[in-house]
Amino acid sequence: MRGTVLCAALATLVACQRVDNTPPASQSPAGTDTGMKVAAPATPPPPTLPSPPTATKVAVVEGFLTPESVKYDTAQDVYFVSNVNGGPLTKDNNGFISRVRPDGAIENLKFVEGAHNGVTLNAPKGLALRGDTLWVADIDVVRAFDAKTGAPRDSVSLASLGAVFLNDIAVAPTGALYITDTGIRFDDVGNVLHPGPDRIFRIGPDRQVTVAVRGDTLGRPNGITLDSVGKRFIIVQFGGRSILAWKPGEKAPSVIAKGPGGFDGVEIAGTRLLVSSWADSTVSSYETGQEVKVITGVPSPADIGYDAKRKRVLVPIFTGSRIEIWQLP
């Protein structure tokens, strides 16, 4: 305020000095007004910054049953979609994984199907790929399938460590798997309970299972992804509002950004850090530490995927039995 008043005063002073250079009244021609007033120049309005470009919806693929996660396989140029097909903690062996082509055509709705061909799959959620192996988080077990044939390859139970709600998986360069345990259950009427604890498990290349990190700072951890540039993992809170960074060996993660909360999926898309939120039905970028909405109007956006070849965000609509494909600008 003081700066504005000072500028106005200086402008008026300059204007008055210009007026004082006019001839005195006695020398002025008759009828000439020598009391001319000069207004201070108006302060120009601040420039209007353009809104950040948003993504464009290019396809909607329907026909799924509670889709939770989408993962892009660069080697096969195909999308995998996990289908819970029921309660997220129900061991009913009716979960399945779909194969979808980038044009939106469902190549095989039940590429991997519980209770078929020797497969056990209850409520599949987060997906991860390493080579031609597709890893799947399934309540308290992590399962592996051949990404080309769908045949079962491996199964690692975390039940003995008290796993409650295995949610998402990320693969380290060493081949170790890091799996979030959101630590939630549901009562008979569907209310969310949080018996905890909040943890991230590690499955080593030797299949040895350990607790990599635990604690309330994880905030019901949901999505996890590897930041290969920062040599760290990015973790998002479902029960809080924080986006976290963590390196193996650290006792606790650090907060790198905050947003609306209710976070589910996280992907690094080029230079963008993309996070989906149930709280406001969006996918936003946080690479600067500030929220920038990229996709809006997506209810229950679960564990998003990213098609790096086409620069597309793959959004599973958990309660809508569909996935939406969005083109980044």
Range-by-range predicted roles:
Residues 55-61, 106-118, 151-159, 208-215, ...:
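A short beta-strand motif characteristic of beta-propeller blades
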Residues 93-98, 141-143, 198-201, 242-244, ...:
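A short loop-to-beta-strand structural motif that recurs across blades of beta-propeller domains
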Residues 16-19:
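Bacterial signal peptide processing site
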Residues 100-105, 146-151, 203-208, 247-251, ...:
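Short loop/turn segments that connect beta-strands within beta-propeller blades
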Residues 85-89, 141, 184-188, 240-242, ...:
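Short glycine/acidic-enriched loop and turn motifs that connect beta-strands
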Residues 64-76, 87, 115-133, 160-185, ...:
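Beta-rich, blade/repeat-based domains predominating
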Residues 43-67:
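A short helix->beta-strand "capping" segment at the edge of beta-propeller domains
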Residues 82-108:
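Beta-propeller domains
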